[in-house]
């Protein structure tokens, strides 16, 4: 069983697609009804940043609960280190929005266009994953994985704006 956590409009067939937003018709709104140790893969694309900072560990512990031993989570988040570098280097093209100057684009990006509550560096996410019980925590590249199962990265988007992290239960 594979879970797309925070699926939005991207709802692949044969995955359990979960989103709390009522505009998306999904079978589940959270992980509560997913049995313990039942899932092989969880993909969470640009979702952890929408969770209040103090609730992130609770979400990661739920991932641990539903993953089978050896199951893997793949999390992608806005890469704030790259964003700061782009800002310092006056790279307006890093920020794909319609604002007319770098400062406005950077400001909009930092709040992930008003949807973000928690931006994490890759190291901060690594610590949170470790503290939640994950192991083999690895930063991976866009469309690359530490697994032989390519399904885990088929939902990747935003190659230049995001970083990708995988961890095993």
Give the role of each language-model region:
Residues 1-8:
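Conserved class I S-adenosyl-L-methionine
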Residues 9-36, 44, 141-142, 146, ...:
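Adenosine-cofactor binding site in Rossmann-like domains, unifying the SAM/SAH pocket
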Residues 41-47, 56:
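A short beta-strand submotif of the Rossmann-like class I SAM-dependent methyltransferase core
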């Amino acid at each position: 069983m594979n879970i797309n956590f925070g699926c939005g409009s991207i709802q692949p067939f044969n995955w359990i697609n979960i989103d709390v937003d009522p505009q998306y018709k999904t079978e589940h709104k959270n992980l509560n009804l997913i049995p313990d140790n039942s899932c092989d893969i969880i993909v969470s694309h640009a979702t952890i940043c929408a969770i209040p900072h103090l609730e992130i560990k609770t979400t990661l512990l739920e991932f641990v609960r539903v993953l089978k031993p050896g199951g893997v989570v793949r999390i992608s988040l806005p890469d704030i280190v790259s964003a700061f570098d782009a800002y310092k280097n006056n790279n307006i093209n890093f920020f794909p929005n319609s604002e007319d100057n770098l400062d406005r684009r950077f400001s909009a990006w930092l709040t992930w266009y008003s949807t973000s509550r928690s931006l994490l560096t890759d190291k901060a996410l690594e610590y949170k994953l470790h503290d939640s019980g994950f192991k083999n925590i690895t930063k991976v590249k866009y469309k690359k994985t530490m697994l032989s199962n390519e399904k885990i990265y088929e939902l990747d988007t935003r190659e230049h704006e995001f970083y990708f992290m995988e961890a095993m239960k």
